[in-house]
Amino acid sequence: MKKNIILTYVYLIIAISFAIISCNKNSNTEEIPQKENPKKENPKKEEPKKGDSSLLAYSKPFYLFTETKAYEMTKQEKDPYLKKLYYQIAATPTAEWFEGVEAFDDTTLKRLIEGAKAQQKTPIITLYGIPYRDCGSYSTGGHKTAASYKVWINRTSAIIGKTPIIVIVEPDAHNFCLKKGWKYNDAKYKERAELLSYVGKTFADNNPNALLYLHIGGTELKQEEAAQAVIDGGIRYMRGFVTNVADHRGTPRAEKWSEEFVQTLQKKGLGTKYYVIDTSRNGIDSPKQTNKAYYYSCNNFNAALGVRPTTKTSAPHADAYLWIKHPGLSDGTCANGDPEAGSWYPAVAKSLVQKAIEKGIIEEWKVPNNF
C-alpha cells in the first residue's frame, strides 16, 4: 500500500514537472520574436520639426530624373575633367519644370511619376506656366489665357493622383511683378492671385500626398507685402512657401527671413506654414555681379553651387533645402554672348562646380565607369 502511494506521488511530481516545462516553453516561444526582431521606429517620423509626422514625400529619397540637359550634356562630354564637373550637377536630384503649353509636358510628367514610383523615391516638380510669366523678363511665356492654365492644372493634378510629390508653385509669380509696379488692385494681379489659389485648391482637393510651396521670391519684398501676396495667392491651401528660387542669397539669410515670415503669416491667422529653400546656386551669399544684367543672379560667374538637396535643415520650419533652378542652364541673354534662357551654358556650369568644390560646399562624386 505504502509502495503504491509513493509511486502515485512520484508520477504526480513527474506530471507536474512536465506541465511546468511545457508552459515555460510556450511562454518563451511567444516572447522570442519580440526579442530577436524588436520593432524599429522610423527616426524620420519621430522628428517633431516637420510638424506632420505623416509627410510621405519626405519619407523617401529624392528622385533623380535623367531626362535633363545636364544629364545629356554630361553623357556626351568627352573631356574627363569637364565630365567630372558636369556630373556633380547631372547626378543631383533637381526639380523638373513644366509649363504645360506643349503636349509633351504631360507625357514627360507621366514618365517622371512612373520612374519615381518604380524607384520608390519622391519626385520634385515646378509649375511654371502662369499667363504673363516672368512679367516680361528673360523667361517670358506661359499660357495665353486663364482658362487654358486651369485646364492644364486639372490635367497635372490628375496625372499626379496620390503620388507623394513636392510641387514648387510658379517662381516669380509675385515678386517680379510687384517690383515692376503691379498693384494689388490691378486686374492682372487679381487674375494671378485667383489662378494661384486655383492651383492650391485643386491639389488640396485631389492630391493628398502633394506638398505645395508657393514662391515668394528671395528676400526682396517686405514682410507685409509678401504676406498679402501669398494670402491672396491661396497659401492657405498649401504646405507653405519657397524662397530663393534661382537666386544666390545664402541659406542663413534666407532662413532668417523665412522664419520671420512664418511668424508674420501666423499673426494673420494662417496657422503654421513651412518652407523650402533653393540652394542650387547659393553657395556664396550674394556674389558680386559679373555682367550688366539688372539683377545679380543672371549668369553670375562668381556664384557657386549650394548644398545638395536634404531634409537636414537648420531652422524649425524649413522642410528641406532643394535644387529647384537647374544649375548650368542660362538665365537669359544677360550679357553679350549669353545663350537664351534655359539653354545649357557650359562655362557657367563649370564655374559653379569649381567654386563649390574649392570651398568645400559639396562632396565631389566619382563618375561611374559606364557613364
Regions found by a protein language model. Give the residues of each.
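Bacterial N-terminal signal peptides that target proteins for export
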Residues: 1-10
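Bacterial N-terminal signal peptides
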Residues: 9-19
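Bacterial Sec-dependent N-terminal signal peptides
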Residues: 20-53
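N-terminal carbohydrate-binding/catalytic regions of secreted carbohydrate-active enzymes
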Residues: 58-155, 159, 325-352, 356-366
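Hydrophobic faces of well-ordered beta-strands that scaffold small-molecule active sites
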Residues: 60-64, 95-96, 123-125, 165-169, ...
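Surface-exposed substrate-engagement region within the catalytic domains
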Residues: 65-90, 219-349
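Substrate-binding cleft of extracellular glycoside hydrolase catalytic domains
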Residues: 103, 111-212, 228, 235-237
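Short, ordered loop/turn segments at secondary-structure junctions
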Residues: 128, 172, 217-218, 246
